[in-house]
Amino acid sequence: MNEPPPKRQSVFAKGMKKLQRSKSLLNFAEQAKPPTPENFSSLDPKSNLNSIGLSLVGYGLSSDHLPPPRLDTDSESVSSRTSSPTLHVTTKFNPKQRVESFQTATNFKNQIPPEEIVDQLFEKLLSIRVFPDEAVYSLKKQPVERKWELLLREHETNHHFDLKKLSEQATDKFLTNRDRFQEHEFLIMSRSTTQEPKPKLKPLRIVSGGEDYDDEETPTVTKLVHDDSSTSKLSIESGGSSGAPTETESLLGLVNKKLKIRDGSPDWYVSRIMANKLSLKDCKKLERKLVENNVVKNSGVTWTQGFINAQGETALSVVLTKINKKSIKSNEEFDKEYLIVKCLKHINSEKRDETSSLKEKVYVVKALVFLLVSPRLTTRILVTEVLVMLMLLRDKTLWKSALDGLSSLQDRNGDYVIFQPWLNAFEETIIKYSWSQNKAGELSNLKNYATITLILINSMVDMCSSLKRRISIRRDFGNARILNIFEKLAQIEDTRIDNEIEKYEMYAEEDYNEYVEGKKKRNSKQLPNIPQSKLKLLQVSDFVTTPEANTSLEEDELTPELEDNLSGTESSFDEKSFMTKLKEAEDIESDGAMKSVLQRLMKLKQSERSTEDVHKMLVLVDSMLQHVTNESRVIGTDAHSVLNITIQKLMDRLSTEDMARRAVAESKMLSRQLELVKEEKELLEKELETNKIETIRELKKENYYQAELIATQERQLSKLQQKIEQLQSPNNTALPVVDVGQQGFGNGTVASLKDTSSSSPSKRPPTPPGLYSMQKGSLRGGISAPPMLDFKDARPVSDLQDSRPVSDLQDAPRLVESSAPPLPESKDPVAQPPPPESKDSVAPPPPPVPDFIKSAAPPPPPLPGFMNASAPPPPPVPEFIKSSAPPPPPLPGFITTTPPPPPPLPGFITTTPPPPPMPGMLQPGKVKELGTLFKEKHKQEPQKGITKTKADVVPSIRPKNKLKQMHWDKLENIEKTFWNNLEDSVLSNKLIEQGVLGEVEQVFAAKTATIKKKTAVESQQQPTKKSFLSRDLSQQFGINLHMFANLSEEKLVLKVLRCNSEILENHSVLEFFNNEALVELSDSLFRNLAPYSTDPRTRKKPMKNPEELERADRIFLELCYNLRHYWRSRSRALLFSQTYKKDYIDLMRKLNIVDEANAALKKSESLQNVLGIIRTVGNFMNDDAKQALGFKLDTLQRLKFMKDDQNSMTFLHYIEKIVRHSFPEYGSFVDDLNVLSTLHNISIEQLETDCEEMSRSVKNITDSLERGKLSNKKDLHPEDRILTTISSPMLNAKNKNAMLQSHLKRTAGELNSLMTFFGENPKDATARNTFFYKFVTFITEYKKAHVENIQREEEQRTYEIRKKILEDKIAKKEKLKEESAEPEAVVDTAEESSAVIDSLLEKLKSSTPITTNRAKTKNRRSKALSFYSENPLEIVADTKYESVNNLKRRMTTRKRTTDGETSPKSEQFMSRAQAMLHQLRNKEE
C-alpha cells in the first residue's frame, strides 16, 4: 500500500523491533494485564488521574498541576453530521470493547477505518504526546496497521482518549471536507520516497501554570507537526526519574543516539531539563556555561544563543514554576531555583532579537514573580534584579504578565490587594533585619534588597504611559501600605533608597497635579462635537479589542486624546464590518472568547425578552466588563469575587443614580417655583414704579376704618350682653336660643331683628323644656344655624381676620349707641327672612350644623331668641341708648323700627373675640363719613355712672401672635377707684397711632408649639380598631410583612393560603410563620379572638365583625388562630420544602470535603514517616520508662514548646531541619494535606447533627402528610393549596435524604476507621471534633518553622562568608605588615603632636551634621500621597512579633529624637575630640 521507506526510516524501524523484543514498548503479547506504571508510566491510569491522561513521551518532566489537553474539534463538522450509519466508523469498530492485551489489539486488524481517518486520529494522538522531531517524523511514516494498534492501546490506557468520539468527529470532518482534506493530507502525509518533504517546525504549547495560567498562552517548545487546525495544545508531564526505563525514555535514548546529541551541548541540557533529570550539579555546570558563553563549534553562534534557540529559557521557566508550586521545598530545590534564576539572568543579558523572544519572556516573568516572596533573601534580590531587567525592556506584555503573576500570587495567599503578598514580605524583611543582632553584617544586603525593590516599583509605575493606569497602580501600592514601608526605609538613611523614594513621591505629585488640572478642564469644557460623517463610520468593530491592541493596554479617557482621535482623517476609521472582522479572527485563539461573548450578546438582543429586561442585562454585562478590565486586579482573578463586587458596585451606582435623578427632579421643581416668584416680584416692582402708591395708601386707610368699626361693634355687643344679663332675674322665663353661624351680623341678622321687633308678646310660644341646658351647651360646643341664614357665600371668620392688616387699624372711630331711624325697605330677596308660620306654631329645633362650620374657628356666641319670628320680644331699651344724637347713615329699607340691642357676649369671648364680617349695609365710600359722625357724637356725650367692663379697657386691636402673659393681681371691682375714670379709648388709640402696641407685639412674642388635633370628621371617618396582640408581636408582623403593605388583609391571607410564589420565595416570611409566638396562644388572647373566629371545618360565621381588628390582629386571626389545628405542621412543611435543596447541597459539600480529607490523610505516607521521625527522636531523648511505640495527636501541639539549650530553636524547628536535610521527599506531606485547610470551619459534630435534623424533618412532614394533621383535606381551608405545593418537593426530598444519610454513614465509618488508624478514640466527642484541627495546626506551625529555619540558615551562611572575608583581609594585612619591615613614623616633639591634634579638631569642627530634606518633602507631598491611599486597608501582621517590633521601633525613634534634640552631632564630634585629646596627652605624660 505504501512505498518502501527510505534508509533512515528502516534504521529506526529496526530499533523499534529491538524495543519490541525487549518488551519495553510494543510487545504486549505475553502480558496478561495492561502495562504497569513501572513499565509504562506514561500510560498508567493512576497517573492519568493527575496528569489528565497526557504524557511527555521522552521527557519525564512532571505536570501534575497542569490542565488537561484540549482536543479541539471542528464544531461545524459535528453539527453537519448526517444520519447515515455508513458514515460512522462504529460500523467497523466498537471502541467500547476493552483491549486487554496486544493480542486483543491484533484481533481488530480487520476492523481498521479508512486510511485517511486513521491518519487524522494518529495526528490527534501525536498532538498529546511529546516526541523529538525526528521521532515524530518517523512515526508518521509507519503503516496504517501499526498506527491503528497504537491508537487502540492509547484508548485502552488513557480514558480521556475517547476513540469512538474522535472517530466520529474525524469521519464527519473527512466526509464534509473530502476534497480539501485529501489535498491537505497529500501535502502533509505524502508517502513519496523519492522526495521527502522538509519537516515544518511549529511551536508546541506547554501549559505550565496549571490553574494560574489556564487562560493564558502557553510556552512553546519546537515540535514537528503538520499545520492542521485541529491540532490541540499540548502539555508536559513527568514520566518519572526512577524505576525501569519507560517507552519514551527508550525511544529518546535511541533517537539521541541516532542524532548524536553531544553531551554538554545546549540541546543536551534542554533535553535533560525537559526530562526532569537536571541535577543540582548540572545546574551549576549550566550556569558556568552561560557565564563563559563560548562560541559553539560548527554553528557560529554563542553558547547562550544556542541554548535560547533550543528554547532552554522556556524549559527553565517550566521547571521553576513546578518548584514554586511546592509549599515545602528541600535545600536542593532552594539551591536549584537560585541557580535557575541566575541562568535566566545570564540569558536576559544576552543581546538578541527581543521581538522574537517576547513570548518566551512572558512565562519567565510569571515564573519569577512567585519568587518575590521566597524565604531566602538572596533569591529575592536576584529575582528582583531580573525583573528590573525585563521591565527595562518597556514592553507592555511583560508588564501585564507581571501583574497577572502577582494576581495569581494574591489568590494563592488569599490577600485582598494585588501587591500585598509582595510588600508584606518586603516589610517583614525590613523589620527583621533592622533589629538583627548582626546588624553590621546584614545591613548591606538589606540596602541592596530595598534599593532594587524600589527600582522595580518605580519601573512598574513608569511603564504606564496613561495617567489613569498610573493612578490605579499607585492606589494598589497605597492599599498595600507602601507609605508605611517608606517610613521604615527612611530610618536606614541610605542615599540610594532616599533617591528612589524621592522619585516615587515626586512623580506621584506630578500625576496628582495633572489629574486635578485635567479634572478641572473636563468640568469646564463640553464634550467634543463628533462630525456626522465620522459618526457614521463608527462601527461595532471599532470597539472590539484585537490581539494587537491587547499589547497596548493603554486606554486613556482624557478629553484631549479623544479630540485628537476624532480630529484625524476618515482613513483612521476601520470600514470593515463587524462580521468580516469576526470571520477573520476565527482561527485566533484570543478571539474565540470574544466571538462567544458577542454571539451571546446578539442572542440576548434577539431573544423574546422585553426591551427593559434586555437593557438591564446589558447594563450588568457592561459594568462587569468595565470592572474586569479596569479594577479586577484589586481583588484578583477569582470569578466569584469579580462577579459579586461587580454586582455590588452596579447596585451602588444605580442607587446613586436614583438619588441623583430625584435631586434633579427636585431642582427642576424648585427652579420653576423660583421663576414664579421672580415673575411675582417683577409685577410688584412694576406696581411700585407706577403712580398707584397714594391709591394703595387710601385703600389701606379704609381697611383700617372698617376693621375699627368691626372692633367697635364687638365692644358694643359685649356691653349690651352684660346689660341684658344684669336685667334678667332668676324668675324670668328663659328665652329660646337660636345659634348663629360664623357670618356674624349681616343682612340676615338685621332682617331677623326686624321680624322680632314687629312681633307681639302674645304670639310667642312657650319655652321648650331643657332649653337652658341647651343654651349652655350651645355656647361651649357646636353651633347650629337656623334655616333663615344663607351659607353659600360664607367664609370663616379666620379668613377675614387674617386678611385684615394690623397696621391699618389706627384711626377708626367708635360706633356710638343710638336709635336708628326708619329706613326704606329693601328688595333684596336674599336678605328677606322667611315669613313666620302660624301663630300656634312652635319654634322648630335647630338644624344640624354643617361640616364646614365644625372645622372653622370658634364661633361667636348665640344671640337671644328674639331673632326668631315667633320669639318673645326683647326687654326695653336702656336709657343711654335713647339720645338726640344725629342719625347714622340710612339703613336698608327692610328695617322699619328701632332694632333691639344684641345680647352681651360670653366672658371667654370678650378676651379674644373674633371679629365678625363687615355689615353688608356699610359701603366703603361712606365709611369715612360715618366714622366722623361717630367720633363727634362720642365727644359730645361722655359716659357717666357706668362701671367699666373688660371690653372698655382692652385695646381695639389684638395681636396676631400669642405674647408673653403679664402676671398681676386683678381688681374685679373698680367702681370707686381711679381705674374707672381713665379714658381708655383715648389712651388705646394713641398707643395704636404711635405704633407702641406693634412694637410690644414684636418684643414680647411668645414661642408656642403648634399642636395638630384631629377634627371630628377624621375621627368619624377612621374609627379606632381593636388590638389584642402584644406590641412586640404586632411590630414583628409589620416588619416581616412590610413588602405586602399595599395589599389588604383579605388579599394577603389568600396569597398565603394559595402558596403564592412571592410568599414561597421569601424565606424570611416562612421563617416568621414558624415562630413559636404564632403557635402558642395565651388564654387571654384565645378568649379575646374567639368572637371573631371562624372554623373551616364547621364553616361557622364569626359573632363579631373581624374588620374591627387591627391589621396585624386580623392576619393573625385568619391564619394562626382559625387554622391553629394545623398551622404548625403547615408552616414547617412549607419552609422545609423551600429550603431543603440548599441545605442538601451544603451538607453534601461538607461531606465531600471530609471524604477528601480522610483520603488525603490515609494515603499520605510522607505524614506517617514524619510522625515516625518524631517518635524515633523522642524515644532517643527519653528514658527507658518513657519509651513509646506511638503517640496521640495531642503531642503534635506540644512540639513547639520544647526548646534547645540556648532557647533559640524549638523541637519542631529541629524536626523540620531533619526532614529537609535528611528526608526531603517527606516534606511533600504539606501539599498532600492541603485539602485540610478547607475544614477549619466544619464541625463534625454539627455536621452529623444537621444531617440527623434533616432526616427527622423529612420523617415528621411525611407522617403529617400520610396520617397527621395534613392528611385529611376536609380539615384544611378551602383556599389552602399546601398539599399540591409540597407533594412533589417532599418526594424529591425523601430521595435526597436517603442519599445524604447513606453518604453520612459511609463518611462516618471512614472517619472512625481513620481515627483508629491514628490511635484516636472515635467515641470521644472531643477527639472527634478536634481530629482534623490537630493536623491543620501542625501543618501551619511546620510551615512557619520551615520559613524561619531557611532564613536563620541563610543568615548564618552570610555571617560565615563575611567572617571568612574579614579574616582573609586581616591575614593579608598581617602578611603585608610582616613583609614590610619599615618602622612607623613617631612623633618626637610635643609641638608636632599638638599640631596633629589641632588639625583633627579643625576637621571635626568643620564637619557639618548630615541633614536630609525628607521632612520637607513629606510635608510638601503629603496631600498628593494621601490621594493614592484614600482607603488604606488595615492588614493584620503575619507574624506575632510585628507589634513588638513596632513598639521597639517607636521607642528607638523617640530616643533618637530626644538624643538629637539634646546632643547635636556637632557636640558629639567635640566630645569625641576632647576624649582623643585627653588620651594623647596621657600617653605623652
UniProtKB/Swiss-Prot annotation:
GO terms for cellular component: cell septum; cellular bud neck; cellular bud neck contractile ring; cellular bud neck split septin rings; hyphal tip; mating projection tip; mitotic actomyosin contractile ring. Residues 65-88, 226-248, 549-575, 746-874, 1447-1471 are annotated as: Disordered. SUPFAM superfamilies: ARM repeat (SSF48371), Formin homology 2 domain (FH2 domain) (SSF101447). Residues 231-248 have a biased composition (Polar residues). It is found in: Bud neck; Cell septum. The keyword Cell division applies. GO terms for molecular function: actin filament binding; cytoskeletal protein binding; small GTPase binding. Disruption phenotype: Lead to a cell separation defect. Its main location: other. Residues 110-636 form the GBD/FH3 domain. It comes from the Eukaryota. Keywords: Cell cycle, Cell division, Coiled coil. Residues 553-564 have a biased composition (Acidic residues). Residues 660-734, 1240-1312, 1351-1382 form a coiled coil. Residues 953-1368 form the FH2 domain. Interacts with IQG1. Belongs to the formin homology family. BNI1 subfamily. May organize microtubules by mediating spindle positioning and movement in the budding process. Required for cytokinesis and the maintenance of polarized hyphal growth. This is Formin BNR1. It comes from Candida albicans (strain SC5314 / ATCC MYA-2876). The gene is BNR1.
